[in-house]
Amino acid sequence: MIDWLHEWACVRENGLGTRLPWDERWLIESLSDSTIYMAYYTIVHLIKEVPVEFIDDSFFDAVFLGKGHSSGVDDKLVEKMKNEFDYWYPVDFRNSGKDLVQNHLTFYIFNHVAIFGEDKWPKGIGVN
């Protein structure tokens, strides 16, 4: 099912996506960018209270991973966001089309395993 992965480009030069931090000419491959958005949904109603200049890696590490401290953001707000994430995660069940098994859903698993602890990995995936 993943024997094609060694041929998959992990970056590209155009389109939408997140810039590669060490080389702004490149964009991170979109499947890597689009498979953990549901984590963001858990805090979207609160993030508007955070000044944009403080939304950085340390902020997301504090909220999603419980690591470090997010400077410039009220600790109680960070804790509230962390509690929201912990309440809604892990995803109990993700349903998608069978045509997405070999790409989107595979990256969905890969990225959750790479970023989050095992207690936040998806619990179930269904295809139709």
Predicted regions located by residue number:
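Structured secondary-structure scaffolds
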Residues: 1-128
